[in-house]
From Swiss-Prot:
GO molecular function list: ribulose-bisphosphate carboxylase activity
Superkingdom of origin organism: Eukaryota
InterPro entries: RuBisCO_ssu, RuBisCO_ssu_dom, RuBisCO_ssu_N, RuBisCO_ssu_sf
UniProt record similarity statement: Belongs to the RuBisCO small chain family.
This protein's name: Ribulose bisphosphate carboxylase small subunit, chloroplastic 1
Gene label: RBCS1
Presequence boundaries: 1-54
Chain's role: RuBisCO catalyzes two reactions: the carboxylation of D-ribulose 1,5-bisphosphate, the primary event in carbon dioxide fixation, as well as the oxidative fragmentation of the pentose substrate. Both reactions occur simultaneously and in competition at the same active site. Although the small subunit is not catalytic it is essential for maximal activity.
SUPFAM superfamilies: RuBisCO, small subunit
Subcellular locations according to the entry: Plastid, Chloroplast
Cystine pairs: none
GO cellular component: chloroplast
Amino acid sequence: MASSMISSPAVTTVNRAGAGMVAPFTGLKSMAGFPTRKTNNDITSIASNGGRVQCMQVWPPIGKKKFETLSYLPDLDDAQLAKEVEYLLRKGWIPCLEFELEHGFVYREHNRSPXYYDGRYWTMWKLPMFGCTDASQVLKELQEAKTAYPNGFIRIIGFDNVRQVQCISFIAYKPPGF
């Protein structure tokens, strides 16, 4: 019987600190502990209306553009706008007016992914109203913006300077025909 001996240099390291550690599991686990029946994810099997599943219709997007918060409601009158502005002032947020002359809704011109490159940046009307405590001051600025840009969209935002986030945003004025 012929035998051959191959000699190769081998370097081994011994870690004395890990001598009490158990080697990781390297074999296959038994499948006996796992369920073998596949669940059915079809929602028609759990429908309680005799097997007929009806879905709700989404809002039709053609000819009914929606803008921001409260845009599904009728336009706000001056008293309702004042209440919204009082709310954001009570929360300690800083009111600010923004306007847009061309696109008052989300649009994608150069990018197809939803994010901040989809037409959400509007032009700021003056500076944020730091120190504002009265809703009539904001409504006065809104009137000035409406006279300056009668064919533009104007929105009021509330900015939280502690968390540095925009907390509320709603359309305060839409041009005629929208």
